[in-house]
Amino acid sequence: MMIKVGAAINGTDSPKAMKREHDNDDGDRTGRHKRPKTDGFTEAIQQGKFEVRLLVSSKSAGAIIGKGGENIKRLRAEFNAHVQVPDSNTPERVCTVTADEKTVLNILKDVLPRLEDNFSERDPCEVRMLVHQSHAGALIGRNGSKIKELREKCSARLKIFTGCAPGSTDRVLITSGEQKNVLGIIEEVMKELKEIPIKGSATPYLPAFNYDPSNISDYGGFPGNMPAGGPPNNRGPAPQRGGQGPPGGPRSYGGAITQGGGQRSFEAGDFQQFRGGPGPVPGYAMSAPGYPPQQGQFGAPNNAGYGYGPGGGGPVTTAQVTIPSDLGGTIIGRGGERIARIRQESGAQITLEQSNGQPERIITIKGTEQQIHSAQYLLQQCVRNSTQGRERFGGSV
């Protein structure tokens, strides 16, 4: 969700497939594209409640809603809470939960196992949460002191992306680890934020209006196989992002994967060089000032974003990398599920050749520049999050 909870997008690549029937409820259908007139967070606090907004994949949104809206109606009735997932034929949607703090946590405990956003062996649970940009600064603290305290207290990974979601004043907080630890982070965040009024204007993120696949690595959104050349539904460019946090500079990549048929060993030089490829990815930002880089967070080292998808078009090229043969199963996954997921999320064609008794296997990646970057990053994370990868290369994500 964003809580934003991370979700894998399987079978929801086309706008038609991603657009569910209006099974949220009648209210969602009639009001799903209305821009909110009030600040829901402040209104909830005034009523003694708390509003949590989760960024979830379209597939996970379907799991929250359930067939015919059955599950979302159950949540509302069982917990006497406001739960809403407005329609949007984009790869991501926003799930809003409003209730007292204890009830919010109970709803999340109910919902998290249903989500399909999590695929890391290391982190069985991952959540993405939308927070106002002024709250993001408070949660990071001076020189990163507050966010470090939260990580240590709850024994969970935690990151806040530097960029605002398109057309909004929202930033994405992402946390992962054991479910109880993730819920602990969320509980601590609620305790902190209920005492801090929002500063400045508040413009909530509305994926139906503003989703922009070219910016997902900047704000922490979900990739999807959108039509080349721009956002879905021919809406044109997303509006200018309001109140965006300080941008990071582009991050260059090492050359562990070469294009045009060349090969390079997965183990050549530093393991992290696996990120190599056709050059810097636009918007793949480093950490903001006051947010110290730290190995052991989400995404690439130094907080350089969290995944990025197919994006726009461009010339199709090929990249190759060799990996130790015994890591092939780690990339393929049970029944081919893991490599299928990477193909789905990156939009690239990925072929893993047979080892034929050789110590190394060749992975061929074909697609646009951004698709190749996305596939490289997801493959790297797949290996680094696996038990074999950690044993071989050391360290943690």
From Swiss-Prot:
Superkingdom, natural source: Eukaryota
GO biological process: DNA damage response; embryo development ending in birth or egg hatching; regulation of mRNA splicing, via spliceosome; regulation of transcription by RNA polymerase II; regulatory ncRNA-mediated gene silencing
Sequence ranges assigned to domain KH in this UniProt record: 49-111, 124-189, 316-379
Keywords from the UniProt entry: Cytoplasm, Nucleus, Repeat, RNA-binding, RNA-mediated gene silencing
Null mutant phenotype: Temperature sensitive with 35% embryonic lethality at 20 degrees Celsius and 80% at 25 degrees Celsius. Of the surviving offspring, 30% are sterile at 20 degrees Celsius and 76% are sterile at 25 degrees Celsius. The majority of non-sterile animals have a reduced brood size. In addition, animals have gonadal formation defects and display a bursting vulva phenotype. Reduced number of miRNAs including miR-58 in embryos and L4 larvae. Defective neuronal cell fate switching, whereby fewer ASEL neurons adopt an ASER cell fate in an lsy-6 mutant background.
Compositionally skewed regions (Low complexity) per UniProt: 224-241
Compositionally biased residues, Basic and acidic residues: 16-30
Subcellular location field: Nucleus; Cytoplasm
InterPro entries in UniProt: KH_dom, KH_dom_type_1, KH_dom_type_1_sf
Region (Disordered): 1-41, 220-279
Main location: nucleus
Matches recorded under CDD domains: KH-I_HNRNPK_rpt1 (cd22432), KH-I_HNRNPK_rpt2 (cd22433), KH-I_HNRNPK_rpt3 (cd22434)
Keyword presence, Repeat: yes
Molecular function per GO: mRNA binding
SMART domains: KH
Tissue distribution of the protein: Expressed in gut, muscle, neuronal and hypodermal tissues. Highly expressed in the germline and oocytes.
A Gene Ontology term for the protein's cellular component: cytoplasm
Pfam families in the cross-refs: KH_1
Function: RNA-binding protein which functions together with alg-1, a component of the miRNA loading complex, to modulate the processing and activity of specific miRNAs such as miR-58 and let-7 to regulate gene expression at the post-transcriptional level during embryonic, hypodermal and neuronal development. Promotes the lsy-6-mediated repression of cog-1 in uterine cells. In embryos, may play a role in the DNA damage response.
Record's subunit section: Interacts with alg-1; the interaction is direct and may be strengthened through RNA-protein association.
Name of protein: Heterogeneous nuclear ribonucleoprotein K homolog
Source organism of the structure: Caenorhabditis elegans
Gene name of the encoded protein: hrpk-1
